[in-house]
Amino acid sequence: MNTNDIWLIAGLGNPEAKYDGTRHNAGFAALDYLSGKWGISVSKTKFQGLWGQGEVDGHKVVLLKPLTYMNLSGDSIAPMAGFFKIPADHVIVLCDDITQNPGKLRIRPSGSAGGHNGLKSIIARLGGDGFPRIRIGVGAKPRPDYDLADWVLGKFPAEDAKAITDRYADLEAAANLIMDGKLSLAQSKYNG
């Protein structure tokens, strides 16, 4: 293992139990899947987050669930990245995406926040948008006048939850490809 090959994978969400199973916590749920699959316990506390570290296919990996609430996610991610000297392009963010149908993945190497306040916070705290992200489709509001906060903080219907969990293996494979330096391949194989 190359000692400089370290990655931070952060799943975004809100920390209280009442938010479990909500659209906005899709990143937390995906990180829980990776934690279980990779055998990395996310139970230590540091920099306003729950974290753990391990090795995945030769890569040193730090998994993080910021406990700052969604809109302040950068307040946990940036100090954690700084502590481990992880450059922004080795920070992979998992988050919800209301512009994609449930279960659709959208992998990007960088880009704007696209209206996502968690990403906005991370961009501000890291000082740029040059970090990869895997956005998890949670579905759009049912109608334009539907309150956005009510929508993202609402629970998934069973069929939407299944559409998302059915993509966890693809999300894991995409994260592995990104860590292997094959982000473009991850996009072509798993976007959509």
Q: Which functions belong to the PLM regions below?
A:
Residues 1-110, 120-134, 141-147, 154, ...:
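Nucleotide and nucleotide-moiety/phosphate-recognizing core
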Residues 114-118:
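Hydrophobic alpha-helical segments within soluble ligand-binding/sensing domains
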